Every structure is written in structure tokens, then in C-alpha cells.
Amino acid sequence: MNRFLSDESIATHSDYVRIKRLKYSIIESSVPKLKGARIRDVYRMRLAPYDKRDALELLSEIALHELFFVSFSHSPYPAADAVRRAYGSEANFLNEVYKQAMSLPYGFLLVYSFGGRIEVRECTDLCSAYYRSAPVLALDVCEHVYFSDYGFDKERYLLAALPYLDLTRLTESP
């Protein structure tokens, strides 16, 4: 990530995730059955609606940020075979990711891999990110990620970040 985000931006974003973890620990202490629960477990739990929503939002946001931090490599990776099969080329895939990310006002752009089939989805409702399956790549398009390095210029951020997406992750099973 330090190829396209400054150390200060990465540290700020890491602190943001740490604060989300602290908030979740407060919810865990007030709802003991949430202690150690995974996202899919929380979906199935009988909880007060606001507890469930808060827990799902925080757990999903933490998980998506952790995925965001590992979705990039130190150098550009060649496209996985699944990318070439689904999109014809790495350039076509990255263009699709770019177009969707540019149109997304906030949230995450998530990439799912289903047995060689690749799907790019917008995610503005954190509770839905892990509902059916786990994404294998995440791109945070909220301004708080890139503002200190790129101002409000999302396009510059995307053009700098996208070449470093670790496309080899698209061959892994979620």
C-alpha cells in the first residue's frame, strides 16, 4: 500500500480500524454472546435489532478494512487465469473496477470469486458485504482513505492503486 498511500495515510486508516475494534468490544461487553462471534454467526443470532445492526456493521467494517489492507501487493501482479477468462485481459478487468469505483460515491468496491467466476460489486451497506459469501479483494473508495495524499481526486487515487491490486487472490477460495 505504501506504493500509493503515504505512511501517514496508512497509519490514520489503521487507527480508524482500531477505533472500530474498540467500539465492537464495547458492544461485546454489553451483549456477551457476541464475544468471539463471526459475521455469519451474528446473522443467525436472535438479538435486538439495533444490537444486531451495530454488531454487523462494525464486524463487517473491520473485516473489509482488514481485507483492504491485504488486497494490494508491493509490485504489480500478473492477472490470474480467472481474470483473463472472465474479462479477456487484466486491462479489461481493471477498467471495470475503475469505472465502478468512480461511480461509487462512498463505501467499498468488492471482488468475489466463485469457482473461477469473478464478480465486482458495490457495497455501501456494510451489513450486506458478507451476507452470501466473503469477498477476496476490497477497494475502499471513501475519501478518508486518500484525502491526505490526493485531496478530493478519487481518479488519481484509483489510477495509483489499481495496478497494485493482488489479482492472484482471485484464484483463492473465499
Where are the language model's segments positioned?
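Feature for soluble, non-membrane regions of globular proteins
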Residues: 1-174
